[in-house]
Amino acid sequence: MAETLKEDSIMIREVWDYNLVEEFALIREIVDKFSYIAMDTEFPGVVLKPVATFKYNNDLNYRTLKENVDLLKLIQVGLTFSDENGNLPTCGTDKFCIWQFNFREFNIGEDIYASESIELLRQCGIDFKKNIEKGIDVVRFGELMMSSGIVLNDAISWVTFHGGYDFGYLVKLLTCKELPLKQADFFKLLYVYFPTVYDIKHLMTFCNGLFGGLNRLAELMGVERVGICHQAGSDSLLTLGSFRKLKERYFPGSTEKYTGVLYGLGVEDGTTTTVAN
């Protein structure tokens, strides 16, 4: 079970340009059996705030997300796969496998970033020079993602924590375009690529007394971290474990009615933009 995994039982598969094709080949082999995917991204923080005024917070939240995602560049994506019982793939090894994809686009010497975010990532072991030299091209990643079976697939359930920015970067990567101006158009794209989405932060609003970030939730749920905080692979595994514990404790029945909502988004000009799955 994902929530009882220990450090020595996990292999974080570091993915660079040289092994990207091989790792996606492994993912294609497991995706039918391991159809829950917990996802986390690392990016250069939030640097822009819209100058316009908005009547509704969700409109402000989306515009802030759009302007930052359009401008900034992805650093890491972490993916943890599990089956419906929380079991993780081993991919022919004696360890459970999760994936951490490292991208080349962000250049700390040339690109805009939030200083505190980059310093935190550096302290957590991200080597920005290595990413430039050996990292993945985002366009190539998007092409392989499209043919991998993990997107455009009704059988896959995606799990994030406060996942607006995570999905914003993936939608930008998959479309090779800036995010739509209208939030409703963003959600239309989201549901094409990711038909079933869970945002743990949204689920927590139905759990009396639960608040705060992923680390706090994991601690409350008794889920131990494996790997380094603020690296996408480790965070995606912690997301999966927390999701499973939350479901067991607070949602004993079906959770389908909670899909399709990203925390802080989903209302435009006072009208709901999300749709039932």
Curated annotation (Swiss-Prot):
It catalyses: Exonucleolytic cleavage of poly(A) to 5'-AMP. It is found in: Nucleus; Cytoplasm. Signal peptide: none annotated. One of its GO terms (cellular component) is cytoplasm. Its EC number is 3.1.13.4. The keyword rRNA-binding does not apply. Keywords: Cytoplasm, Exonuclease, Hydrolase, Metal-binding, Nuclease, Nucleus, RNA-binding, Transcription, Transcription regulation. Its cofactor is a divalent metal cation. InterPro entries: CNOT7/CNOT8/Pop2, RNase_CAF1, RNaseH-like_sf, RNaseH_sf. GO terms for molecular function: metal ion binding; poly(A)-specific ribonuclease activity; RNA binding. A divalent metal cation binds at residues 40, 42, 166, 235. Ubiquitous transcription factor required for a diverse set of processes. It is a component of the CCR4 complex involved in the control of gene expression. Belongs to the CAF1 family. Component of the CCR4-NOT complex, at least composed of CRR4 and CAF1 proteins. This is Probable CCR4-associated factor 1 homolog 10. It comes from Arabidopsis thaliana (Mouse-ear cress). The gene is CAF1-10.
